[in-house]
Amino acid sequence: MVKVGVNGFGRIGRLVTRAAFNSGKVDIVAINDPFIDLNYMVYMFQYDSTHGKFHGTVKAENGKLVINGKPITIFQERDPANIKWGDAGAEYVVESTGVFTTMEKAGAHLKGGAKRVIISAPSADAPMFVMGVNHEKYDNSLKIVSNASCTTNCLAPLAKVIHDHFGIVEGLMTTVHAITATQKTVDGPSGKLWRDGRGAAQNIIPASTGAAKAVGKVIPELNGKLTGMAFRVPTPNVSVVDLTCRLEKAAKYDDIKKVVKQASEGPLKGILGYTEDQVVSCDFNSDTHSSTFDAGAGIALNDHFVKLISWYDNEFGYSNRVVDLMAHMASKE
């Protein structure tokens, strides 16, 4: 089992760690975070307002974080080049600070003995992989990769199924997205993106997202055919993608439901879900799928123009894919 270090013990860092312990697919051996001391790590890992208390044991012992009896080395380095991943036995590093998202910046981890880096965010220049969509294109000459964004992980599997069966001529995506850490609790300064600085709990905030364009990077045939935007809404977790697209081949809405359901039970099982239930966002909290197609929510204007709806736990589904990508990469060593 591949040994993993986590850089940045925020929402994604902690939930990747949870997902690793839940699934047993990778072995977490080290964590670096300069802003959280060991005792605080114990507390933050144990208690989670969104996903509930960790079902297991967490304690600090001999300067290490001990989860379910397993000791994890703790570093508190600000500069990624100074983290001694090699000494801790970490072969792969999850870069989940949200800061070091380029090849150059994430590459600093290699100096400390890591063999590969997985950026848990979209990257301007690192190759992006979405499980179930283009993970087979990974080859082990790549030292630094990106797991794309939570929204790309929701949209891409659905877009792939639709494009493979009916062909997407063009499409627009909207994600109605839960609050994340980059937002402000009350109105505050936000650099160039003034709207993003408005109170997160009080507003529906139109925002940009590169998620739809990024689908063109993981599904090259869709390059230039999709774009999109986001509305940030006052919910703590779980988001939903609305893909409105023009189809090449005529398709009844029932035909679309059928192929998505087949994919969810076959090649994309565990990644793309399917439901005909009368669900709402809360029903997907702590759901491990990248995307769950809501058959009852979508609509067709005609046989060539449809609106498709898919839910995702933007924290936990994504964190589980980070683990899956690392396990896939390890299988290619």
Curated annotation (Swiss-Prot):
The UniProt record lists the keyword Repeat: no
Name of the molecule in the record: Glyceraldehyde-3-phosphate dehydrogenase
Keyword set, alphabetical order: Acetylation, ADP-ribosylation, Apoptosis, Cytoplasm, Cytoskeleton, Glycolysis, Immunity, Innate immunity, Isopeptide bond, Methylation, NAD, Nucleus, Oxidoreductase, Phosphoprotein, S-nitrosylation, Transferase, Translation regulation, Ubl conjugation
Chief location category: cytoplasm
Subcellular location: Cytoplasm, Cytosol; Cytoplasm, Cytoskeleton; Nucleus
Organism expressing this protein natively: Felis catus (Cat)
Site, Activates thiol group during catalysis: residue positions: H177
Glycyl lysine isopeptide (Lys-Gly) (interchain with G-Cter in SUMO2) crosslink location in chain: K184
Phosphotyrosine: residues bearing it: Y40
Family membership noted in the UniProt record: Belongs to the glyceraldehyde-3-phosphate dehydrogenase family.
Pathways per UniProt: Carbohydrate degradation; glycolysis; pyruvate from D-glyceraldehyde 3-phosphate: step 1/5
PTM sites of type N6-acetyllysine: K59, K192, K217, K225, K252
Binding locations of D-glyceraldehyde 3-phosphate: S149, C150, T151, T180, T209, G210, R232
SMART domains from the UniProt entry: Gp_dh_N
Statement: the UniProt record of this protein carries the keyword Nucleus: yes
Modified residues (N6-malonyllysine): K192, K213
Residues the record lists as S-nitrosocysteine modifications: C150, C245
Motif [IL]-x-C-x-x-[DE] motif, residue numbers: 243-248
Residues the record lists as Deamidated asparagine modifications: N7, N62, N68, N147, N153, N223, N314
Residues recorded with modification S-(2-succinyl)cysteine: C150, C245
